[in-house]
Amino acid sequence: MSKKKKTYQNTLSEKEAKKVIAKLADEIRHHQYLYYVKNQPEISDFDFDQLFKRLRDLEEEFPQFKDLNSPTLVVGSDLDKDFEKFQHKLPVLSLINTYNDDELLDWVNKTDPDGLYSVEWKIDGASIVLYYENGMLKNGVTRGSGGIGDDVTDNIRTVRNIPLRLPEPITVYLRGEVFMTFKDFEEFNELSSGKYANPRNLSAGSIKQKNSADTAKRPLRIFTYDATFPGFTKKFKTHQQILSKLEKLTFPVPPDTVFVNGSKIAETIKDFKKKKDTLGFPTDGLVIKLNDISKRDAQGYTSHSPRWARAYKFDAIMKESRIVDITYAVGRTGKITPRVEIEPVNLAGTTVTFATLHNQDYIDELGVGIGAIVRVAKRGEIIPAVEEVITPGKDVFKIPDYCPSCKTKTIKKENLVDLFCPNPDCPDRVKNGIIFYCQRKQMDIEGLGDKQIEFLYDHGYIRSIADLYDLKDQKEKLIEEEGFGEKSLAIIFNGIEHSKQKDFRFLLPSIGLPELGHKVTELLIEHGIDSIDEILSIAKDKKRISSLLEIPGIGPSTIKAFEENFSDKRILKLIARLKNAGLKLKADPIKVSDQQPFAGQSWCVTGSFENFQPRDKAMDLVVYYGGRKVSAVSSKTTHLLAGPGAGSKLEKANELGIVVYNEKQFLDLLKSLKINFKNTI
């Protein structure tokens, strides 16, 4: 029996609901970026889904506050600026997650209680789309935004069980998951001094290597699980037939897949759970799909997910261990995070020796102390955490009132339970800020890892990220230090010099200012704020700062951070030094296709369309051919694509004299440009 859905109208006013919806949307976008781009999730899948579900429920109750760019309407993105962009030729959507039998069976009963369903392993790896033409592998593309992905074909060709030539000259587009077996991961990680957290992160990072020779060294594999056969004369009636065809084409498919009646799904799940711990590859659940293709077509899609499939996520596996020690770390933002050292246990294929405690409230609630026997789980199969205390240890651990690094009295920020060190000169804060700046997804400075940066700071060579660009002046002294020989220094200096080629898109987020990460930076660029100089100009004008609230995805907390950061003399001095060092303080233009008919144009979309579902597909097309997609109409918008149901955007476009296209006119425009949109989106 399904549970009655929670409502919020009795507890939230419209004003409060608007704020909560905006805050939830920002938070979800942040976690989508961490998961899809950085491969560094901060929360479990379950916690993410609870955020997502609450936002979706609130948007249903308060539809007037639903943003057209809400995370509930789009797929998370793993787009990377280092790769050519590729317009997907089939929908690349995500699945709605379920976490218990009741929730899953409720969906089955509503969908087709007597129908046949496939039940298969949900592989925990990196999502990929393979495009074959006439039997030859043409492209391997990441999921990306769902419309446009990163072309990683050269890397995909190195995956050992992907066929490069098929036994028949067929055109087929497939979805699959690149992964690494536990055995291969352990062996590779041992050779790499244990620096990789888990198979999923390593797999995702491997297909994004800039040099395919590096990818080839990594023992990657793939399972394919769905396909589209454009132009194929034989129409498949079932998912079972599609999987059978894939096997005949020599594609590996997930093992143990079964096809059962809806009434047998709960029993089947129990059988899969018994097998889970014996698998040689990482999985975080099951995928249940309608087998009948015609029934799938009848169910259709939301803009985010197919209605005919669900992911069933396993409960986190727990293992018992003993707490050996409790320590705390001061991050670059000043946040003080406790963690426990435990006796080693194996979880989800990796050896775990540390687990998170989050904050003092969490510690007090569990009663954590040294010597305690605890249960540890990997949240979402990734993040180890103490979930339960079985036998208490010594006194419950207390986070100190003073920063463990600089002894400054700690503070609590508004509406947060965490403690923070407020001292911007705190050694641990500064060191972690420099470490963050040098990371691959930031300024990507080769040769400068955690240990090297800690050494350079502790021995007085650097005190800020700007000091990195003067480090070469100290070469004669540095070369005398252990571990900093001629070869090592050459790599470091080359890495520092190479970082000057990273533009504003990377520089602003890498500085590490609160609320100004990659997502906000992209939003600013989308709205024409594409340089540090432009930001500093806005920061001097309160009206212009307030106008940033008109950008969907930017809320009051971002505005507050904007005001505080760019009036801070320390930040202004840092920016001046980076500018003098020759860094690129303006965003470079991005090209995704050799053909650029929409170059210099900014398009917005509103209403609904027959040929573009969801409507963002039309904007993906514009971006692919050189244009820019914007989420709101402004004086800088050049074109508006308007369909039935267009509202305030159309009114504003008419007021501003912006060129407006309806769907037929847009299709005629594409035809005149010799763009076959059906072969592109």
UniProtKB/Swiss-Prot annotation:
Residues annotated to bind Zn(2+): C403, C406, C421, C426
EC identifiers of the protein: 6.5.1.2
Alphabetized GO MF terms: DNA ligase (NAD+) activity; metal ion binding
Source taxon at top rank: Bacteria
Catalyses which reaction(s): NAD(+) + (deoxyribonucleotide)n-3'-hydroxyl + 5'-phospho-(deoxyribonucleotide)m = (deoxyribonucleotide)n+m + AMP + beta-nicotinamide D-nucleotide
Stored SUPFAM superfamilies: BRCT domain (SSF52113), DNA ligase/mRNA capping enzyme, catalytic domain (SSF56091), Nucleic acid-binding proteins (SSF50249), RuvA domain 2-like (SSF47781)
InterPro entries documented for this protein: BRCT_dom (IPR001357), BRCT_dom_sf (IPR036420), DNA_ligase (IPR001679), DNAligase_adenylation (IPR013839), DNAligase_N (IPR013840), NA-bd_OB-fold (IPR012340), NAD_DNA_ligase_OB (IPR004150), RuvA_2-like (IPR010994)
Transmembrane spans: none
NCBIfam families: dnlj, PRK07956.1
The protein's name in its UniProt record: DNA ligase
Species this protein is from: Leptospira borgpetersenii serovar Hardjo-bovis (strain L550)
Lineage of origin: Bacteria, Pseudomonadati, Spirochaetota, Spirochaetia, Leptospirales
Protein encoded by which gene: ligA
